Amino acid sequence: MAAAVRQDLAQLMNSSGSHKDLAGKYRQILEKAIQLSGAEQLEALKAFVEAMVNENVSLVISRQLLTDFCTHLPNLPDSTAKEIYHFTLEKIQPRVISFEEQVASVRQHLASIYEKEEDWRNAAQVLVGIPLETGQKQYNVDYKLETYLKIARLYLEDDDPVQAEAYINRASLLQNESTNEQLQIHYKVCYARVLDYRRKFIEAAQRYNELSYKTIVHESERLEALKHALHCTILASAGQQRSRMLATLFKDERCQQLAAYGILEKMYLDRIIRGNQLQEFAAMLMPHQKATTADGSSILDRAVIEHNLLSASKLYNNITFEELGALLEIPAAKAEKIASQMITEGRMNGFIDQIDGIVHFETREALPTWDKQIQSLCFQVNNLLEKISQTAPEWTAQAMEAQMAQ
């Protein structure tokens, strides 16, 4: 039967007629090829592709028929469809500029098959082949944004955050132009995941936390985003940014539902955390979050050591390296190195006396900090009063009169 299809195609290519008539006849041959099965179907469809890319067939007809051809292929068995997709891409390549739309469709379908097979890298690379910026066809913003996000997500699934970041950066140039709220959410999720994989934990936590307030997102997914925000905050390097994020999460009542709330509470209250208290939390982490740092310790170990060091700085005026090492459950030399790094980076106040082997902690004066906080609060209260008086001047006047009368 495949031979009959090939013969029909050869005869039709040498015949003349209107585009409409010829397209109708090619469509009948395509339907006949689709009805076949097994090896016969495969050979017939390959013959059809070869005919469509032949220069003797009008471009108007071949584009139209290849578009129809693409709509039929997802209904075929994945193994057959995959072979046909690869064959089509190979045959179209010399005339790819003439069939950009059809090639994009083929690549999207082929990527879906690879994704079902969990072959993430091949799925991503197939989509990368779509010339979104360099081709003749002008793709709309949403299509480009969705494709870049899909590529980034596939590279993340393949544990390649470097490539994922490259494509999320391309998506970031487009996301402000899109009005599709669902795509905006997908962008934020993907960007948060890229930051998470790249170990930029505090930035990832901020993105996840922002997502946890989006009402368009389902409640269970909002809680999942909040969980990721909490995990990333715990893994982040100790410092002011992390302290602010800990405060934000601790004040969020939803966090009390999360399994890691106990660790959050200890960190927010500047309590020393012991290694045996971390086992349950460590089991909740994703594989990339369990990676080791340059000194051989895990990301979690490093984060907790830094937290404990910061907590110790609020308990002691000074402490020897030996005592600090015992407190942090690490060698004295490692304790000195981490303390030195944190002081140098401005994440902890103090100085090191290497001759006596002592680290001295400095506390900031409390009064100026309180003054600034009170000043900020008064400023915000004034702003609120001004907005109330602008919105409801009559009510404000009555309230002030009542206050004066007391």
Swiss-Prot record:
Domain of life (superkingdom): Eukaryota
Modification sites for N-acetylalanine: 2
Gene3D superfamilies: Winged helix-like DNA-binding domain superfamily/Winged helix DNA-binding domain (1.10.10.10)
Xref: InterPro entries: CSN4_HTH, PCI_dom, PSMD12-CSN4-like_N, PSMD12/CSN4, WH-like_DNA-bd_sf, WH_DNA-bd_sf
Pfam families, A to Z: CSN4_RPN5_eIF3a (PF18420), PCI (PF01399), PSMD12-CSN4_N (PF22241)
UniProt domain PCI: residue ranges: 197-366
Residue numbers of N6-acetyllysine PTMs: 25
Keyword terms of this UniProt record: Acetylation, Cytoplasm, Cytoplasmic vesicle, Nucleus, Signalosome, Synapse
UniProt entry tagged with the keyword Zinc: no
GO cellular component: COP9 signalosome; cytosol; synaptic vesicle
Localization, UniProt: Cytoplasm; Nucleus; Cytoplasmic vesicle, Secretory vesicle, Synaptic vesicle
PROSITE patterns: PCI (PS50250)
GO BP, sorted A to Z: protein deneddylation
Annotated function: Component of the COP9 signalosome complex (CSN), a complex involved in various cellular and developmental processes. The CSN complex is an essential regulator of the ubiquitin (Ubl) conjugation pathway by mediating the deneddylation of the cullin subunits of SCF-type E3 ligase complexes, leading to decrease the Ubl ligase activity of SCF-type complexes such as SCF, CSA or DDB2. Also involved in the deneddylation of non-cullin subunits such as STON2.
Family indicated by similarity: Belongs to the CSN4 family.
Assembly mode: Component of the CSN complex, composed of COPS1/GPS1, COPS2, COPS3, COPS4, COPS5, COPS6, COPS7 (COPS7A or COPS7B), COPS8 and COPS9. In the complex, it probably interacts directly with COPS1, COPS2, COPS3, COPS5, COPS6, COPS7 (COPS7A or COPS7B) and COPS8. Interacts with TOR1A; the interaction is direct and associates TOR1A and SNAPIN with the CSN complex. Interacts with STON2; controls STON2 neddylation levels. Interacts with ERCC6.
Name of the featured protein: COP9 signalosome complex subunit 4
Species, as recorded: Pongo abelii (Sumatran orangutan)
Gene, per the UniProt record: COPS4
